[in-house]
From Swiss-Prot:
<keyword id="KW-0408">Iron</keyword>
<dbReference type="InterPro" id="IPR002057">
    <property type="entry name" value="Isopenicillin-N_synth_CS"/>
</dbReference>
<feature type="binding site">
    <location>
        <position position="279"/>
    </location>
    <ligand>
        <name>isopenicillin N</name>
    </ligand>
</feature>
<feature type="binding site">
    <location>
        <position position="279"/>
    </location>
    <ligand>
        <name>N-[(5S)-5-amino-5-carboxypentanoyl]-L-cysteinyl-D-valine</name>
    </ligand>
</feature>
<feature type="binding site">
    <location>
        <position position="87"/>
    </location>
    <ligand>
        <name>N-[(5S)-5-amino-5-carboxypentanoyl]-L-cysteinyl-D-valine</name>
    </ligand>
</feature>
<keyword id="KW-0045">Antibiotic biosynthesis</keyword>
<feature type="binding site">
    <location>
        <position position="91"/>
    </location>
    <ligand>
        <name>N-[(5S)-5-amino-5-carboxypentanoyl]-L-cysteinyl-D-valine</name>
    </ligand>
</feature>
<comment type="function">
    <text>Removes, in the presence of oxygen, 4 hydrogen atoms from delta-L-(alpha-aminoadipyl)-L-cysteinyl-D-valine (ACV) to form the azetidinone and thiazolidine rings of isopenicillin.</text>
</comment>
<feature type="binding site">
    <location>
        <position position="268"/>
    </location>
    <ligand>
        <name>Fe(2+)</name>
    </ligand>
</feature>
<dbReference type="GO" id="GO:0017000">
    <property type="term" value="P:antibiotic biosynthetic process"/>
</dbReference>
<dbReference type="GO" id="GO:0016216">
    <property type="term" value="F:isopenicillin-N synthase activity"/>
</dbReference>
<dbReference type="Pfam" id="PF03171">
    <property type="entry name" value="2OG-FeII_Oxy"/>
</dbReference>
<feature type="binding site">
    <location>
        <position position="214"/>
    </location>
    <ligand>
        <name>N-[(5S)-5-amino-5-carboxypentanoyl]-L-cysteinyl-D-valine</name>
    </ligand>
</feature>
<feature type="binding site">
    <location>
        <position position="189"/>
    </location>
    <ligand>
        <name>isopenicillin N</name>
    </ligand>
</feature>
<dbReference type="InterPro" id="IPR044861">
    <property type="entry name" value="IPNS-like_FE2OG_OXY"/>
</dbReference>
<feature type="binding site">
    <location>
        <position position="183"/>
    </location>
    <ligand>
        <name>isopenicillin N</name>
    </ligand>
</feature>
<protein>
    <recommendedName>
        <fullName>Isopenicillin N synthase</fullName>
        <ecNumber>1.21.3.1</ecNumber>
    </recommendedName>
</protein>
Length: 329
């Protein structure tokens, strides 16, 4: 059962001290992160150093230029049986059934010579990209953005480590860049005169995506300013505000697992809004063989009750379960 969050408050936290060397300032940020993760489970990270206007420009340009044939050629196996990829690729809209479309890509370090690729390890794929003559700046931007977001997310994890009473670099080994299973999804929700049928929540709320817990270590999301997200609290579903320039951060189920739900994965859902908008999550994941032993965070009253779980097994089973529960995105 999901944890019902005690609050709907989503604070904005200046994370710039986490990039510096002032231990006292880092501790103050960690205290704010602690309050957010124990409150609504969400916070906005500001002063993050990412050019979000360029991000929107590149993604809008990409979605506007993609042809139907390009979308099919890049589509994952669920939409194109000729493509064996199940993670990297295009997630197509289906006329009359599904309006949302997206492109997901993985670690740029996953080349044919990467040991996990060579071994055919699940969840590892060499990225497919659209034609570089038609989309000249897309791949270079995306690869740079992936590395920038991995660095930002690793810095955030250092703040979470301090918030949990652990050494600052407690999570670093599990997040090594060359093996990271992290992913970026470039999701477009269109405005349509005639929208396909959408789901309805138990409370009557129309939904673009039903309630779920993120399969990640943490999720770091930028989205355009159309309010759509809700978090489940002890008082029911409550709206999460938007932000023009900041990243929305929440814990995924691996963080919940290793902290015994001290930092839970908040249950959340996407309201149906017929408006053109972008949702651009970075899902921070560890390497396939990474294992973080569950521990008792500083200040927690319970003992460790979860077993150690390799990140590869966690991710493979978690993503499969999410598709079974909520359908193919």
């Amino acid at each position: 059962m999901p944890v019902l969050m005690p609050s709907a408050h989503v604070p904005t936290i200046d994370i710039s001290p986490l990039f510096g060397t002032d231990a006292a300032a880092k501790k103050r940020v960690a205290e704010e992160i602690h309050g957010a993760c124990r409150g609504s489970g969400f916070f906005y990270a500001t002063n993050h150093g990412v050019d979000v206007q360029q991000l929107q420009d590149v993604v809008n340009e990409f979605h506007g230029a993609m042809t139907d044939q390009e979308k099919h050629d890049l589509a994952i196996h669920a939409y194109n049986p000729d493509n064996p990829h199940v993670r990297n690729g295009y997630y197509k809209a289906v006329p009359g059934r599904k309006a949302v479309e997206s492109f997901c890509y993985l670690n740029p370090d996953f080349g044919e010579d990467h040991p996990m690729i060579a071994a055919g390890t699940p969840m590892h794929e060499v990225n497919l990209w659209p034609d570089e003559e038609r989309h000249p700046r897309f791949r270079p931007f995306c690869e740079g953005y992936y590395r920038q977001m991995l660095k930002l997310s690793t810095v955030l994890m250092r703040g979470l480590a301090l918030a949990l009473g652990r050494p600052e670099h407690f999570f670093d080994a599990a997040l090594a860049e060359q093996d990271s299973l992290s992913s970026v999804s470039l999701i477009r929700y269109p405005y349509l005169e005639e929208y396909p049928p959408v789901k309805t929540g138990p409370d009557g709320q129309l939904l673009s995506f039903e309630d779920h817990l993120d399969v990640s270590m943490i999720t770091v999301l930028f989205q355009t300013q159309v309010q759509n997200l809700q978090v489940e609290t002890v008082d029911g579903w409550r709206d999460i505000p938007t932000s023009e320039n900041d990243f929305l951060v929440n814990c995924g189920t691996y963080m919940a697992h290793v902290t015994n739900d001290y930092f839970p994965a908040p249950n959340h859902r996407v309201k149906f809004v017929n408006a053109e908008r972008l949702s651009l999550p970075f899902f921070l994941n560890g390497g396939h063989e990474a294992v973080i032993e569950p521990f008792v965070p500083e200040g927690a009253s319970e003992e460790v009750r979860n077993e150690a779980l390799s990140y590869g097994d966690y991710l493979q089973h978690g993503l499969r379960a999410l598709i079974v529960k909520n359908g193919q995105t």
